Regions:
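Alpha-helical assembly-interface signal, strongest on the long, hydrophobic N-terminal helix that forms
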Residues: 1-69
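Hydrophobic transmembrane alpha-helix bundles
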Residues: 2-14, 18-21, 82-94, 118-131
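Structured catalytic/translocation cores of nucleotide/phosphate-coupled proteins
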Residues: 12, 27, 31, 96-106, ...
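Short amphipathic secondary-structure patches
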Residues: 41-116
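Low-complexity, S/T/G/P-rich flexible repeat/linker segments used as non-globular hinges
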Residues: 49, 110-114, 118-120, 125-150
Length: 150
């Protein structure tokens, strides 16, 4: 009986921690999918005049704005998981559009051989069980998404 009273709380804490880790993995997957979709939409927003004239793929001049807008839209779908507004998180994200290639990304050091859109963001995700377990109630997730036309 004494052993049960001692071990039961430990098992409960372990179970709660495991469940919070699983929820965190789901939240991270949703945030990464939001960034991936935003860069994909921005890359697919091609300069139609250049495409008709030369047949080459060139990003639209507002590709960075499109990526930021769609990132905010997609984060809004996961707003219950976030510790902050989707618009605020998207506004703070580092969104870069490299309209011509080759280009060098000063943040990552990568060299892009095609026109590219990149989103790098720090997204705060709620982890209330960790907060109850004397850990952080908010976990910041770093997201990096890069897309280019093929």
């Amino acid at each position: 009986m004494v052993l049960t009273l001692v071990i039961a709380p430990l098992l409960f804490v372990a179970l709660a921690g495991v469940l919070q880790l699983g929820a965190l993995r789901v939240a991270v997957a949703r945030v990464r999918a939001a960034a991936d979709l935003a860069t994909l939409v921005a890359v697919n927003d091609q300069d139609d005049a250049e495409l008709a004239k030369s047949g080459s793929l060139r990003l639209s001049a507002d590709a960075a704005d499109v990526a930021r807008e769609y990132f905010a839209r997609e984060l809004e779908l996961s707003s219950s998981l976030l510790d902050g507004g989707a618009e605020t998180i998207a506004a703070a994200a580092d969104v870069a559009a490299y309209l011509s290639a080759p280009a060098y990304d000063t943040r990552t050091g990568a060299r892009y051989e095609r026109p590219t859109v990149r989103i790098a963001a720090l997204v705060p995700v709620r982890t209330p069980v960790f907060g109850a377990l004397v850990l952080r109630p908010v976990t910041t997730v770093e997201v990096l998404s890069v897309s280019s036309p093929r």
